[in-house]
Amino acid sequence: MIQYWRKSLAAVLLLGVFSQTWAQSHSVYFNQHGKITATMSSVAYVRQYTVQSGIAKAQDFYYPSMKKYSDPYEVPAEQIKVFVPVLDNGALTLWHFNGQKKMVGTYKNSKPNGEWTNWYPNGKKSAVMPYQNGLSEGTGSRYYRNGVKESEIQFKHDKANGYWKQWYPDGSPKMEMNMVNDKPTEILSWDENGRILSEISISNGRRNGIVLEWYEDGAKKSESVYSNDQLVKKTHWDKEGYVVE
């Protein structure tokens, strides 16, 4: 019995040594631009990983603090030297140096899938982008650092289709566009005081409508009228409100 126990223990210890050798930990270093570097003074990130059966189990850290830059993830071994790796499946979660979440995105069959979200270091959301099988699909948004929405755009089949709205940092409207396959067909814009700057329709790349300029006191400065992409009339006013020839 004692002899059997000793043999069993030896087998377990040997298996442990073999496993450690098989799954030996490695490191690869990146500079602040995400490029691999062997110059330690320029290292900004370090990736620690093991490889088993062609799959790398990895986690990224800020260097030299070793604060986590990512949660653990798995990628094909050939992706291990790519700073932003493409996962076969699962979530990639990144963190700011101060511990605030930076990004969460999910892969399915090596393609972005579902809602990807980014945050500023202050914890406020910076962007949201929906994906379906690697293509932009749905409504994406961007935000200012103060949390106010900067823009919102509709995607279909990986192109802008639908509305595209933009706002100033105080939340007042800046621009509204109607998009068809990444091209605007209607544009309406305002200045920071809420005055209309342009009201344009576009067909086959040709503009129709008006473009306005304003003085700081709210008086109209100029008005340009376009038809079939040709400027057909432009009127200027001075600060007193008189037409300038």
Set out the residue ranges of the language-model regions.
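Periodic aromatic/glycine/histidine/acidic cluster detector
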Residues: 23-119, 124-144, 148-167, 172-214, ...
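Bacterial N-terminal signal peptides that target proteins for export
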Residues: 1-9
